[in-house]
């Protein structure tokens, strides 16, 4: 079996196909239909759940799907410069880690949300958002919090670690990759713990092992 080193670089870009749904099948199916449809409903969607449930994976995967279709996408997270204006060319707005937004980012998120869903002129655009808590419990201004709960709301669940390790071990064995306990602990401690991201990382490790074998 192929041995792998710990110097594995960055995890690959998430995809919807790479997300292992588990108890999150309804949310995944919703996002598949949402991102693949040419006429997306402007009804907002909000994903919530604990760290490692796959919220950012799904948002980034949905964004990648939209970009591949030639869409323009507005993306807001804690690294976005405050007061970034809404862009009329956007086809969708994605808001990640909303529970971390400070006052200025909340102002920006509210501005983007209103301009997307209820524009003064032109077509409405969908909003996809994610956070740690259900909408009613978010530490946000009330007008933003209530809007995030307007539409489709999905709670995401994390796989138990024992199941996660078992799935990764089976997937590694199927690829002929020897995944030692040391590497397993490193991966689970260093990278996003949602299973979709981890499975894609395993593909990355497999390619890395092949490259180092050839070197």
Predicted segments — roles?
Residues 151-163:
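Conserved AAA+ ATPase "SRH/arginine-finger" region at the nucleotide-binding site
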């Amino acid at each position: 079996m192929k041995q792998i080193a710990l110097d594995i670089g960055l995890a690959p870009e998430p995809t919807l196909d790479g997300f292992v749904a588990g108890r999150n099948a309804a949310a995944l199916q919703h996002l598949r239909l949402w991102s693949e449809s040419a006429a997306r409903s402007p009804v907002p969607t909000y994903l919530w759940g604990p760290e490692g449930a796959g919220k950012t994976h799904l948002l980034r995967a949905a964004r990648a799907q939209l970009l591949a279709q030639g869409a323009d996408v507005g993306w807001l997270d804690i690294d976005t410069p405050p007061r970034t204006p809404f862009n009329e060319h956007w086809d969708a707005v994605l808001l990640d880690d909303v529970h971390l937004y400070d006052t200025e980012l909340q102002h920006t998120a509210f501005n983007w949300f209103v301009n997307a869903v209820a524009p003064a002129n032109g077509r409405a655009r969908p909003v996809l958002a994610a956070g740690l808590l259900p909408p009613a419990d978010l530490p946000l201004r009330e007008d933003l919090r209530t809007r995030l709960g307007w539409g489709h709301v999905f709670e995401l669940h994390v796989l138990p670690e024992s199941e996660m390790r078992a799935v990764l071990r089976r997937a590694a064995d199927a690829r002929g990759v020897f995944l030692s306990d040391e590497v397993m602990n490193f991966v689970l401690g260093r990278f996003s713990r949602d299973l979709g991201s981890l499975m894609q990382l395993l593909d990355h490790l497999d390619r890395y092992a092949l490259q180092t074998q050839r070197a």
